[in-house]
């Protein structure tokens, strides 16, 4: 598993060296780990902020500007709080005094099992005199008053494990902070690595008077049991860059918000619901509809976002493109392209014009007659042009039923027309991939399993990988590549629903997003390609590296995945198994609930009734047993003590085959 490293760089009045340092770090650590750099601007000067935002906001960089100068130690504390979750955390100065190549040596040293490694300069005759004037007193103080090993030197150039970083942050109280004093309160395995500093260094800002005050602060706050007082915060944040807007805060978008938070981004969540799941991970929750492009645009302007994205949902893709176009933000799609892949009218017209196979269809409105409907063969399927989650979709037997249901379908649409199709008996498949420079990389082909309701059709109850029709991979690939071509897609995620029936494979619909069956979890496990990371890079205008996937084939793997999109009997939930208990099962990669105790689950008519999800992994030999073990662990009971969970895919003890 790839290790992660966060590098914290306090910045004070630097307008010449930071870009070079960031570039050096990315070059040195690029192939070694998942790197993220936190620049903490501790001066709050307009010229410095301008330099940092215009020159240093590269990929893998977060810029945090503080409201005033709080000092290097407090800036480090800010970075430590934001870097939670990384395997290792390093701190270094902004003036190139600490070379990136030397940090790599610290990185190698800590892999030997150390908790904390300091980089310290080699001492020649001249440096030794300067060092002994102040730093030696500090080191003696650390050796005598704290648990620092004798002879150990400390500095602002260091790398630590995530456990040390967490201890330092959670164990702090008061308005004085000094990293080494906080870290060495406990016994640690510590090491020094010496290096030759750069010739040109910024002179230390510590006068003798400041050093004495600092030493007294260390003694008072870390050596005396009565010294520490909790009075005021160590810092206040003014701005965080980049600023990412996420459209939607349900379980389907939760991982994007969690990832953005882990990377130190400032996130603005647009979701009209009062308390969406994602709000806990967002910096700002704007209660606006993701369908309302004007409201989302106003929110994006208000918070000066640098990127906007969504996942797991269709219509916000169009909203994101409109906002991006209005604000000149990065986007894989123009507004016109986004309309093509989110509105079934324009989608069907383009597919028909270019010869892509689909089922027979027509557009209907309130003036449509039964005779016009009868131009298609029954049974019929009626759909809104611009909705999602199977809302307003019905399978109907007669033209009269179609016209009777039209008004109900249009309730889920902003259009005055609806799509009418001939029903095609089929197995549904979903293709997920990524498009780079116009070329599609297919990452998975799954069976999209649906609830067998005779009227409310298309409600997905699970994904099965690999598809039982994977033997037709070449046909699937050809159709998928043709769709990419005729839609003019050049970059970004790709999602295609196919129908396999007696007349072959036809296209149902497509989207330019990560699917709603947690493909951001399954695809990295199956392929190693981080699809969520790619989409977030798209939103911020960063390049996506697809090297190694140019000739990738997803039909050559022994891994299997069963995504459970779970539903329950309608009623009020009294008790349910805690999510953490299910995640203890070694084959459960992810799971989540859309309802909690006290929630009332509606009847199953569309995807809004979904209780939750689980991503279950295995092999051909183990997947069926793993699914059974999961459902044996899961319990959802109503107020009468009866189990509510519906075992839809596959039925209990049914073998994992068609």
In which residue ranges do the predicted regions lie?
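Hydrophobic helical membrane-anchoring modules
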Residues: 1-4, 14-16, 20, 181-239
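Active-site "cap" helix and flanking loop/linker of ATP-utilizing ligase/carboxylase catalytic domains
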Residues: 475-496, 502, 511-576
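A conserved acidic beta->alpha catalytic loop
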Residues: 41-50, 96-97
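A conserved helix-loop-beta module that forms one wall/lid of the active-site cleft
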Residues: 325-392
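Acceptor/aglycone-binding surface of glycosyltransferases and processive sugar-polymer synthases
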Residues: 67-68, 73-83, 88, 100-177, ...
């Amino acid at each position: 598993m790839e290790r992660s490293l966060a590098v914290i760089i306090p910045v004070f009045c630097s307008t010449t060296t930071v870009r070079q340092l960031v570039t050096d770090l990315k070059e040195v650590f690029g192939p070694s780990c998942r790197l993220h750099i936190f620049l903490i601007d501790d001066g709050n000067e307009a010229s410095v902020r301008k330099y940092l935002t215009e020159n240093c906001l590269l990929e893998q960089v977060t810029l945090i500007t503080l409201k005033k100068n709080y000092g290097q130690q407090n800036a480090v504390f800010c970075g430590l709080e934001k870097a939670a979750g990384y395997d290792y955390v390093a701190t270094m100065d902004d003036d190139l005094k600490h070379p990136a190549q030397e940090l790599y040596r610290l990185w190698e040293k800590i892999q030997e099992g150390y908790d904390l490694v300091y980089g310290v300069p080699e001492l020649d005759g001249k440096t030794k005199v300067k060092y002994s004037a102040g730093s030696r007193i500090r080191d003696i103080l650390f050796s005598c008053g704290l648990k620092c090993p004798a002879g150990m030197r400390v500095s602002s150039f260091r790398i630590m494990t995530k456990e040390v970083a967490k201890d330092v942050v959670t164990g702090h109280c008061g308005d004085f902070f000094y990293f080494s004093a906080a870290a060495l309160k406990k016994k640690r395995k510590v090491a020094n690595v010496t290096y030759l500093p750069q010739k040109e260094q910024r002179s230390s800002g510590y006068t003798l008077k400041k050093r004495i005050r600092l030493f007294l602060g260390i003694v008072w706050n870390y050596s005396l049991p009565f010294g520490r007082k909790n009075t005021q915060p160590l810092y206040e944040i003014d701005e965080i860059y980049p600023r990412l807007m996420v459209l939607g805060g349900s379980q389907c978008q939760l991982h994007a918000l969690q990832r953005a938070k882990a990377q130190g981004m400032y996130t603005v969540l647009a979701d009209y619901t009062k308390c969406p799941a994602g709000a806990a991970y967002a910096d700002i929750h704007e209660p606006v509809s993701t369908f309302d492009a004007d409201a989302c645009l106003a929110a994006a302007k208000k918070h000066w976002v640098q990127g906007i994205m969504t996942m797991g949902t269709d219509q916000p893709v169009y909203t994101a493109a409109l906002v991006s176009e209005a604000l000149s933000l990065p986007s894989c799609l123009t507004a016109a392209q986004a309309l093509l892949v989110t509105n079934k009218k324009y989608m069907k017209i383009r597919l028909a014009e270019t010869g892509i196979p689909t089922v027979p269809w027509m557009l209907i409105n309130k003036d449509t007659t039964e005779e016009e409907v009868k131009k298609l063969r029954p049974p019929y399927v009626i759909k809104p042009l611009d909705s999602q989650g199977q809302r307003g979709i019905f399978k109907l037997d007669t033209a009269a039923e179609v016209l009777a249901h039209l008004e109900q379908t249009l309730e889920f649409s902003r259009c005055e027309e609806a799509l009418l199709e001939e029903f095609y008996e089929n197995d549904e498949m979903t293709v997920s991939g990524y498009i780079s420079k116009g070329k599609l990389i297919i990452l998975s082909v799954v069976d999209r399993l649906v609830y067998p309701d005779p009227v409310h059709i298309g409600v997905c109850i699970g994904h099965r990988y690999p598809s039982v029709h994977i033997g037709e991979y070449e046909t699937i690939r050809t159709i998928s590549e043709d769709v990419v071509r005729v839609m003019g897609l050049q970059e970004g995620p790709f999602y295609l629903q196919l129908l396999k029936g007696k007349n072959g494979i036809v296209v149902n619909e497509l989207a330019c997003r990560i699917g709603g069956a947690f493909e951001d979890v399954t695809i990295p496990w199956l392929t190693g390609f981080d699809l969520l990371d790619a989409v977030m890079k798209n939103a911020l205008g960063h390049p996506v590296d697809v090297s190694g996937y140019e000739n990738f084939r997803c039909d050559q793997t022994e891994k299997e995945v069963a995504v459970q999109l779970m539903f329950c009997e309608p009623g009020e939930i009294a008790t349910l198994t805690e999510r953490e208990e299910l995640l203890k099962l070694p084959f459960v990669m992810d799971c989540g609930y859309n309802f909690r105790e006290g929630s009332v689950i509606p009847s199953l008519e569309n995807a809004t009734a979904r209780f939750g999800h689980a991503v279950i992994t295995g092999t051909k030999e183990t997947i069926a047993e793993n699914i059974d073990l999961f459902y044996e662990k899961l319990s959802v009971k109503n107020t009468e003590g009866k189990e509510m969970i519906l075992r839809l895919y596959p039925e209990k003890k049914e073998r994992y085959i068609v």
